[in-house]
Amino acid sequence: MMDYAGRVREADTYPKLLRLNAREHGSEIALREKDLGLWKPFTWNDYQTRVRNFALGMVELGLARGDVIGIIGDNRPDWVAAEIATHAIGGLSLGLYRDVLDEEAAYLLNYGEAKLVFAEDEEQVDKLLGLADRVPALKHIVYSDARGLRKYDDPRLMSAEQLVEMGRERQQREPALYDRLVDATKGEDVAILCTTSGTTSHPKLAMLAAGRVLRHCAIYLAFDPKGPEDEYVSVLPLP
């Protein structure tokens, strides 16, 4: 049986763990996404490359350690890639439900001083553009689904593929940069801002260190082991 606790000691952040899995299982399937009725596979190498390009693209935009990056949309590979890429540059990820009300989205993004938001599609882009004046720190909006957005010309907008291309170019100029960024991540550093229920007032942002979450996962897996032959279906919203 795998030594889960030892693996977490070796890779105590999500970017480190992804890099380790890509090295050991690069050509194996890590994720699948259903698109037009067909399951599209992504290998661990695909996954790692997407994360690296997102991370270096954000570095190219001037984002750095301590910056808050918002993510809003459905469960999809780009959500996970955006979150791990955020951690890779030392940023803090802030996930929002795709049906979040405008008032709550504005409050949370402003409270977290989010500088960039990954948005799934036109619906989320419209929501963010409508809130822009209330979230002054927001400088960039990256969308994954370009349908309906061709005629949008707001300077804050860019597609996920444009961000990927920026990251790819940065990788060519500095091939060792991404590994240096990942090596600098620490399990005790806050990586995730998780919204509380907000039953009595505005939601608060609970601060989670990635290392603690991964250690919890290791304890769980020690009692209910999982391996390469097991598959999960992502149903509950990712925030």
Locate the predicted segments by residue:
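Flexible, non-catalytic linker and terminal segments flanking ANL/adenylate-forming cores
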Residues: 1-14
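Structural core segment of the AMP-binding/adenylate-forming
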Residues: 61, 88-166
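Conserved AMP-binding
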Residues: 73-76, 97, 235-239
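Conserved AMP-binding/adenylate-forming core of the ANL superfamily
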Residues: 30-84, 101-106, 159-164, 208-211
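Conserved pre-ATP/AMP-binding loop-to-beta segment of ANL
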Residues: 27-29, 158-195, 202, 225-231
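Conserved AMP-binding A3 loop
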Residues: 41-45, 183, 191-215
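AMP-dependent adenylate-forming
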Residues: 17-42, 148-149
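Conserved structural elements of the adenylate-forming
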Residues: 51-52, 206-227
